[in-house]
Amino acid sequence: MNDKYSDSAGVPWEGRSFEQNAFADDDGKTPKALAAALADVPIDKSALVAALTDSRLLIPLIATLGESEQGPHGQLVDKSAELAIVAVATPDKQTAIPVFSSVEDMTKWKGDARPVPASSQRVALAAASEGHSRIILNPATDAVALRTPALEAIAKREQWFPPHKDPWVLGWCEEVAMRHPPISTIDLFDGDPKLDLSHAELLIQLGMRPSVSPDKLKELLTSFTDELRSEEFNQRVDSIGYRLVVA
């Protein structure tokens, strides 16, 4: 005979507890620090990632048809529906999870989406576990894209610099450039200042000596890129583009 302190499976309730809901008092609005970071023009990427690290985000769940059957008059009738996390294609041919800072921003994207609050760490880990290399924050309004290096920093709660401001990246680029005498100067720029994935994350400007022939240029860039792409560099830099100038 089951006593009154057992559940339907006969497991005693004694010693068990419910996990506290960290977002029980959430008003559904954009967290203040995140709102301030998004309001900056242009956006300070380091400040944005820092704000996101301590922010609550909203994951949209979309109802999808589970099973269906034909009704008595030939119509298709839903037997069941499921809630699923959606992914979207990105301009750089990757995939991303759309997330939102507020219920209002989510409603503007899809009015019937169900908001599920989650820490930014959980969002970053969920994207990685599902094989998505980006998240898109507020795709119907701000439309800010975050790439893998930033997501890893958020997941680990680490300080992050965009690669054109990362001292290690600059030092490594200069070291590799010194091994290639035809390169006289090297400068790093933000390749994607609008965070819209329209260009590579890091723009490398190489000052080439006038003596470099067009035939040798392709070979030089291939060699430079191969040496540049160390394991550490790949962890810090999502993608690169080049701009060549005569120097």
Spell out what each predicted region is:
Residues 1-247:
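An interfacial alpha-helical scaffold signature
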